[in-house]
Amino acid sequence: MDGPQPPALWGSLENRVSELSQKLQGEYFRYKGIPFPVGMYTPESLSLAENTSNVRDDDIFIVTYPKSGTNWMIEIICLILKDGDPSWIRSEPIWQRAPWCETTISAFSLPERPSPRLMCSHLPIELFTKAAFSSKAKVIYLGRNPRDVVVSLYYYSKIAVQLKDPGTPEQFLQNFLKGEVQFGSWFDHIKGWIRMRGRENFLFITYEELQQDLRGSVQLICEFLGRPLGEEALSSVVAHSAFAAMKANNMSNYTLLPASLLDHRQGAFLRKGISGDWKNHFTVAQSETFDQVYREQMHGLPSFPWDRSAEDGSPDGETEPSPSPSPGLASDDPNPGSSQ
C-alpha cells in the first residue's frame, strides 16, 4: 500500500479501542468522579497512570485540558530535543513520539524508551502520576482560552468516534460549563494545576502566548528544559512547529488515524490554529452566560492572556468579520475539525 502507514503499536491500540467502542460507542464511565470515554481509557489504565512508580528525573510531561494545543507543544519539544532537526517529526507519528500516560496503551506500559521520555496527559492534578511530584521530572502545563476550547472540543466531538455526540451547540456549552464532558471541568482542571506555579520543575504557559510570540515562547521552554539553542536551531524549531508546517506533516496531522477512531470525512483534526475563533461562533447570550460562570469560577485567580483579550474585536490573525447576526456555536464551518 502506498504512503506511510501507522506503526504496529498503533494497530494494536486501534483493535482494542475499536472492540470496546463498538460495545459502548459514545458512552462515558467515571473514574473517581471524572468522565472518560469508553475504549481509549479504562479504570485499569487510569489507575496505572496515577499509581505507577515508573517515573524518571529527566522525564518531560506535557499536561493540558483537551483541545488546548497539546500537539503544538509536542511538536515544539520534539524539535527542541533534536536541536531543531525536523527528521524525527517527519518520520514518527506524533502519538508515538509523546505517548499518553492514561490511555489503554500507556506510556508507562510501553517497552523501555530512552531518556528523556516525552509524555502527555489530560489528567486533572488529583489523578496525575503521584510519583512525578516527588521527582525532578519537568511538567509543562499549556492553558488556553476556555471559550476557544469549547468551540474546538465541540467540533472534535463530531469527528472522534469514541466521544459522545455533542448534541446541539447550546447543550454542549451547558455540559462544558457543568463539567459534564470528557475529563470533567475545565475550571477545576486549570485551578488544580495553577497551584504548581512557582515550583522549579513546573512551567505554565498559554496557547495565546505561543501565538503572540512563538520564538520568545520557544526560548522560554528551552530555558526551562535546560536546552539552550543557537539562532539557527531556534529558527528551525519556530519554522517547523508553525501551524501550516504541522498541517502539512502527515506524522503530525492525524491523517494516519483510521476511520474507526477519527472520521476524516467530517473535518480535519488540525482545524484553524488561531485564538479568538469563539467570537465567530458564540451568540451574545452564550457569551454572557459563559462570562458569568467564568467570573464565578475564576474569582481570586491571577489574570490570563485571554482575560485581557476577551473584549477585543477579531480573532488573532483574522480580519474583522462583516457585521451580521451571530450564528451561534454551530456556525457552518468549511473545515469543522479541531484546533491543535
Swiss-Prot record:
Q: Gene3D superfamilies this protein is in?
A: P-loop containing nucleotide triphosphate hydrolases (3.40.50.300)
Q: In which tissues is it expressed?
A: Isoform 1 is expressed in skin and testis. Higher level of isoform 2 expressed in skin and intestine, moderate level in the kidney, low level in liver, stomach and placenta.
Q: Where in the cell is it found?
A: Cytoplasm, Cytosol; Microsome; Nucleus
Q: Any idea of its EC number?
A: 2.8.2.2
User: GO cellular-component terms in the record?
Assistant: cytoplasm; cytosol; endoplasmic reticulum; nucleus
Q: Which GO terms describe its biological process?
A: 3'-phosphoadenosine 5'-phosphosulfate metabolic process; cholesterol metabolic process; negative regulation of cell population proliferation; positive regulation of epidermal cell differentiation; steroid metabolic process; sulfate assimilation; sulfation
Gene Ontology MF terms in the entry: cholesterol binding; cholesterol sulfotransferase activity; nucleic acid binding; small molecule binding; steroid hormone binding; steroid sulfotransferase activity; sulfotransferase activity
Where substrate binds, per the record, is at 95, 100
Report the function annotation for this chain. Answer: Sulfotransferase that utilizes 3'-phospho-5'-adenylyl sulfate (PAPS) as sulfonate donor to catalyze the sulfate conjugation. Sulfonation increases the water solubility of most compounds, and therefore their renal excretion, but it can also result in bioactivation to form active metabolites. Sulfonates cholesterol. Catalyzes sulfation of the 3beta-hydroxyl groups of steroids, such as, pregnenolone and dehydroepiandrosterone (DHEA). Conjugates efficiently cholesterol but has a greater affinity for pregnenolone sulfation. Does not show high activity with DHEA.
Under which name does UniProt file this protein? Sulfotransferase 2B1
